[in-house]
Swiss-Prot record:
GO cellular component, as recorded: cytosol
Task of the protein: Involved in mRNA degradation. Catalyzes the phosphorolysis of single-stranded polyribonucleotides processively in the 3'- to 5'-direction.
Disulfide links within the chain: none
Keywords from the named record: Cytoplasm, Magnesium, Metal-binding, Nucleotidyltransferase, RNA-binding, Transferase
Pfam families in the record: KH_1, PNPase, RNase_PH, RNase_PH_C, S1
Keyword Cytoplasm: yes
Listed GO biological process terms: mRNA catabolic process; RNA processing
Protein name per its UniProtKB record: Polyribonucleotide nucleotidyltransferase
Cofactor(s), by name: Mg(2+)
Domain KH: 554-613
Family membership noted in the UniProt record: Belongs to the polyribonucleotide nucleotidyltransferase family.
Length: 701
């Protein structure tokens, strides 16, 4: 096959799609190049036969950043790439979410997508190129896929409006970082963080992106017209109409009744009993449907029952209407020895959230293609199996936990104080202790509460809510605060977080076509109503950050020294600063501009370290009055300590206007006395006076 190349202009960049030159044994392979900044090789392979033992669609997406792409060699002992980074995991999820709904219902053949960043200039994020490449590779692979999909990143500035596919530098000054993906007809996925933008501004960004990425879809269609392989001859299994009818006729009412049981565990127990009865009755003899087929049909009846009830205006599974938030129970300060804690319960979803403050040394070190950087804010989300009443694997964070943690982080990050105001490293951990829908948004609420309980000066409280959608024909219902079952059986998962003034994060995943601007607008308005309701209840418990940090949190003292003194504080080979830290039990961070942050487990430890630093760096100011302590008396005067490690001499002639025969007639060792600095010679010797203090005070010194 000869290489096929398509070029098109996409915002401020030229994008090139090339196939037929690299990875030709894959079902589909496309090399995406954006200007000369980014190149991503995307391959798609589909298994020709489905694995009969799998009852789900085995799609896997692997996004990987090779260090050679940025001209680097991996650090560490093993000089090769290791396990996926958090960025790679999040981007894999970002690519997966818009393509998964476009494979046909019932398609169970394994599909693997591999996106490899092979070149980057560190100007733009390669994720959009990877999403475009995935869509193009699927379009030419022959695998059944209802694409192509377009994708775009959007930034927003109050003065200039929306900006398509911004650079890293442009994102720094933006109030919005949004990624949108969809088909020519509809939006399928939104992932964003914002600085309190309005619902209209967020919706405008979604629609702007959808309009702009049509050029991507058209280019992929042109590529597929020249390079696509024949579409697989795959047909879905015919619907088991007779089996569905038999289950509905005999068990339909019982299934519908089971979905009025409000307690999840009781409802699941009843549905389990009914499923066993259905299998026992309909999968009994040879020639009848298998147990797997009966269970699948039972699940389809469940799906239709819940959806029909909702669109026809009947009460939801737990008896609520479409706009009501589940009952809230909010507590703060629940863990006595932590820096800040909150227990946030919404219905059968509960998060125990803990905030911990640390020093700059506790910041997360990130080794990315763009270079090393430190992240002073972490939010970790844990979802143990007991939260849903199950036994399960315990271990490191999975893709879902990383994704939910990042969404919660995006939601609260814009409301954190700057490093100049609050130079602590912050770690928030959300432990999901119960789950029945929207645990990530419970984490947002809990994180805001725990941070305020810890005394972190938040700009405003943040709350989050998960919305759902059920659409049958022209009928649709938008659901506030969805349950786990409503998420599973619905057509949309729409999470919105923000303050009373605006949106800080928006995540949307849509499983069907035909989500209109009207539906998104209604969902955003309904989410605002729910968010304000939750914020009102949160504010009754704690409406603003505590005035003081927890007594368990480290004490921080900030100071600045002359840059010439940095070497003195550090000492030869770091000996001086190491000795200060060991002896005072404090930690000291020094910046190149002379800024110093001292962290101590107690106020006393931090102050002791500060005094040690002052003793090394402080200089006596000529003409300034100090309260000093007489350290030593000699025949010709007295040595007075005015600063840590700084003694000056009060000559006997400078003790009093009257003649002084003996210094001890005026001063005693250990006595505190006010002195005026007269001079500091080029050897650092300080000349002091007692008799001139009164005159200096009178003149306003």
């Amino acid at each position: 096959m000869n290489p096929v190349i398509k070029k098109f202009q996409f915002g401020q960049s030229t994008v090139t799609l090339e196939t037929g030159r690299i990875a030709r044994q894959a079902s589909g392979a496309v090399l995406v190049t954006v200007d000369d900044d980014v190149s991503v090789l995307v391959t798609v392979v589909g298994a020709k036969q489905a694995d009969a033992g799998k009852g789900f669609f085995p799609l896997s997406v692997h996004y990987q950043e090779k260090t050679y792409a940025a001209g680097k060699i991996p650090g560490g002992f093993f000089k090769r790439e290791g396990r996926p980074s958090e960025k790679e995991t999040l981007t894999s999820r970002l690519i997966d979410r818009p393509i998964r709904p476009l494979f046909p219902e019932g398609f169970m053949n394994e599909v693997q997508v591999v996106c490899t960043v092979v070149s980057t200039s560190k100007k733009i994020d390669p994720d959009i190129a990877a999403m475009i490449g995935t869509s193009a590779a699927l379009a030419i692979s022959g695998i059944p896929f209802d694409g192509p999909v377009g994708a775009a990143r959007v930034a927003f500035h109050e003065s200039t409006g929306y900006l398509l596919n911004p650079t890293y530098e442009q994102l720094q000054a933006s109030s919005l970082d949004m990624v949108v993906a969809g088909t020519s007809e509809a939006v399928l996925m939104v992932e964003s963080e914002a600085k309190e933008l309005t619902e209209d501004q967020m919706l405008g960004a979604v629609l702007f992106a959808h309009d702009e990425f049509q050029v991507v879809i058209n280019a992929i269609k042109e590529l597929a017209a020249e390079a696509a392989k024949p579409t697989w001859d795959w047909q879905p299994k015919p619907e088991a109409t007779a089996l569905l009818g038999a289950i509905r006729a005999e068990f339909g009412d019982a299934i519908s009744q089971a979905y009025t049981i409000t307690v999840k565990a009781d409802r699941y127990a009843r549905l389990g009993e009914l499923k066993d009865q259905v299998v026992a009755k309909l999968a009994v003899e040879e020639g009848s449907p298998s147990a797997g087929e009966v269970k699948a049909a039972f699940g389809e009846i469940e799906y239709r029952t819940v959806r029909e009830n909702i669109v026809n205006g009947k009460p939801r599974i737990d008896g609520r209407d479409t706009r009501t938030v589940r009952p809230l129970n909010i507590e703060v300060g629940v863990l006595p020895k932590t820096h800040g804690s909150a227990l946030f319960t919404r219905g059968e979803t509960q998060a125990l959230v803990v905030a911990t403050l640390g020093t700059a040394r506790d910041a997360q070190l990130l080794d990315t293609l763009e270079g090393e950087k430190k992240d002073p804010f972490m939010l970790h989300y844990n979802f143990p199996p007991f939260s849903v009443g199950e036994c399960g694997r315990m271990g490191g964070a999975g893709r879902r936990e990383i994704g939910h943690g990042r969404l919660a982080r995006r939601s609260v990050q814009a409301m954190l104080p700057g490093a100049d105001v609050f130079p602590y490293t912050i770690r928030v951990v959300s432990e999901i202790t119960e789950s029945n829908g929207s645990s990530s948004m419970a984490s947002v609420c809990g994180a805001s509460l725990a941070l305020m309980d810890a005394g972190v000066p938040m700009k405003a409280p943040v709350a989050g809510i998960a919305m759902g959608l059920v659409k049958e024909g022209e009928k649709f219902a938008i659901l506030t605060d969805i349950l786990g079952d409503e998420d599973h059986l619905g057509d949309m998962d729409f999470k919105v977080a923000g303050t009373s003034k605006g949106v800080t994060a928006l995540q949307m995943d849509i499983k069907i076509k035909g989500i209109t601007e009207e539906i998104m607008e209604i969902a955003l308005g309904q989410a605002l109503e729910a968010r304000l309701n939750i914020l009102g209840q949160m504010n009754q418990i704690i409406g603003q950050s505590r005035n003081e940090l927890s007594a368990n949190a480290p004490t921080m003292i900030a100071m600045k020294i002359d840059t010439d003194k940095i070497r003195d504080v550090i000492g030869k080979g770091g000996a001086t600063i190491r000795a200060i830290c060991e002896e005072t039990k404090a930690s000291i961070d020094i910046e190149d501009d002379g800024s110093i942050k001292i962290f101590g487990e107690s106020k006393e430890a931090a102050e002791a370290a500060r005094q040690r630093v002052l003793g090394i760096t402080a200089e006596a100011e000529i003409g300034k009055i100090y309260l000093g302590k007489v350290e030593r008396i000699v025949d010709f005067g007295a040595f007075v300590n005015i600063l840590p490690g700084k003694d000056g001499l009060v000559h006997i002639s400078m003790l009093s206007d009257a003649r002084v025969e003996k210094v001890t007639d005026i001063l005693k060792e250990g006595e505190e006395v006010e002195v005026l600095v007269l001079d500091v010679d080029n050897r650092g010797r300080i000349k002091l006076s007692i008799k001139d203090v009164a005159a200096a005070k009178a003149s306003g010194v």
